[in-house]
Structure formats: C-alpha cells, structure tokens
C-alpha cells in the first residue's frame, strides 16, 4: 500500500511533490540513456541468442562457487568421501530451485537450475542418496521431521539445507497498488526480497526444530544455509 499512502502524503502536505518529481526524473533519465523510449521491447530472437550463452553460464557457476563460505569444518568431516554408502539430504532448501535464486528472477526451466540434491546425486548415485524435505521455510503445518529422522538413522552422514527464500509465486495476483493478494491457507517460502521485513534473525517455521532433531540422531551433521539475508547461526556453530 506504499503508493496509495504516498498519494495521501502529498495531498495532506506531509510530502513535497518535488521530492517525487526528482525520483521520477532519475528513472526517466536512465530509461532515456538506455534507449527504452525509442526501443521499448527486446527482440525475442536476439534475446534467445544472448540469454544463457555458454560463457554466461560458466561465469554464473564461477560466481556461485566463489560465494560459498565454509564457516566450520569440525573433525575435518569435509570433503566427504565418494565411497560413502548412504547420505541423507534433508531440508526445505535441499531440492527447491526457486529458493536458490534471487528476487525478481524470471521463470526458469527446471533444466536451467541444479539443486543441492541434484548435485549430490550426480556425484554419488540415486541409490546412495535419500531425500526428505523435513519442513518448509515458513509454513509450520508442513511437518516431515519424523521421516527426516528415520532417513538420518539409515544414513552415514546427514546434509541438511535450511535458510530463507526470495522465491516469488508467479501465480500470485496483485492489487492496483502493486501489493500481493495473499490466499487464505497458503504460506509461501518467501521471507526475503522486496516488501519483506523481519523482526528476527532466527530460522523461521520448523527449521530449528528440524536441526535439533537431526542432531539428536548422533549422525555427522552438515548444515548448509541458502539465504538472501544474514541469519543467526549460533546454534549450528
């Protein structure tokens, strides 16, 4: 409702109209410099040849690899041996493509994005990997923690992928103001990105409960965070 309130602020004298004019001019100037007034639309044929070129994919992979930060490696558990017999891959971010991507990412083909689970299966094999979601990022009604515990007990090591999400629901409808219309009974994973503020740095939903339950199994536990904003990691450390 920011735009509606902005109109009220101008009408009531709380906001000077020149402030808005200045902000609008910046946007229009940039569009002019980019030639968007003369050529507002992209040529689909040119776009198809430009987007996802080999060198772009290689650069994106390099950036993603460089962004990974190892915070702790207790007992030198990493790197894992390729001879390991069974790995449990658990967590709401272990096999969710859009949760790995930033805000305003365009709709993607599944083949364009590899999840953590995809990568582990590639290195091992489907028969040596057991996946359970465990819980959602925010929705507390999603509870597969018991299934996750059982999978952990059957495995030699547990990789749990938690964190946050900037994933937008492309089926979401919007008000005239641009605000999303929330459907009753639905809780998206999105907790980061435009329009999302938080009062806590803790994991949301049942994620902390999932971590503590897996730790109690006594199996070696590797915790991976995929997040778009800083999250508290004191328990995991």
For each feature predicted by the language model, list its residue ranges.
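Conserved, charged catalytic cores of large soluble enzymes
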Residues: 25, 29-32, 36-49
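C-terminal non-catalytic regions of proteins with extracellular/luminal or membrane-system context
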Residues: 1-17, 29, 58-237
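A broad, low-specificity signal for short, low-complexity segments enriched in glycine/proline
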Residues: 46-50, 182-185
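Metal- or metallocofactor-binding catalytic centers and their adjacent structured scaffolds
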Residues: 52, 56
């Amino acid at each position: 409702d920011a735009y509606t309130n902005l109109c009220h602020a101008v009408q009531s004298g709380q906001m000077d109209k020149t402030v808005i004019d200045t902000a609008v001019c910046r946007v229009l100037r940039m569009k002019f410099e980019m030639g968007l007034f003369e050529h507002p639309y992209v040529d689909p044929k040119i776009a198809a040849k430009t987007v996802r070129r080999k060198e772009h994919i290689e650069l994106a992979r390099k950036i993603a690899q460089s962004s990974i930060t190892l915070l702790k490696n207790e007992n030198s558990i990493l790197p894992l041996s390729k001879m390991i017999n069974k790995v449990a891959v658990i967590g709401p971010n272990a096999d969710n493509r859009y949760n790995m991507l930033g805000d305003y990412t365009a709709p993607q083909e599944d083949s364009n994005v590899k999840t953590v689970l995809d990568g582990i299966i590639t290195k091992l094999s489907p028969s040596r990997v057991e996946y359970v979601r465990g819980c959602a990022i925010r929705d507390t009604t999603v509870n597969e923690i018991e299934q996750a515990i059982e999978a952990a007990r059957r495995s030699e090591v547990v990789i749990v992928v938690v964190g946050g999400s900037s994933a937008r629901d492309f089926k979401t409808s919007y008000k005239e103001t641009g605000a999303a219309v929330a459907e009753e009974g639905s809780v998206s994973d999105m907790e980061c990105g435009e329009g999302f503020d938080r009062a806590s740095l803790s994991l949301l939903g049942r994620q902390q409960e999932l971590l503590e339950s897996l730790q109690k199994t006594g199996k070696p536990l590797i915790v991976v965070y995929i997040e778009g904003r800083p999250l508290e990691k004191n328990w995991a450390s």
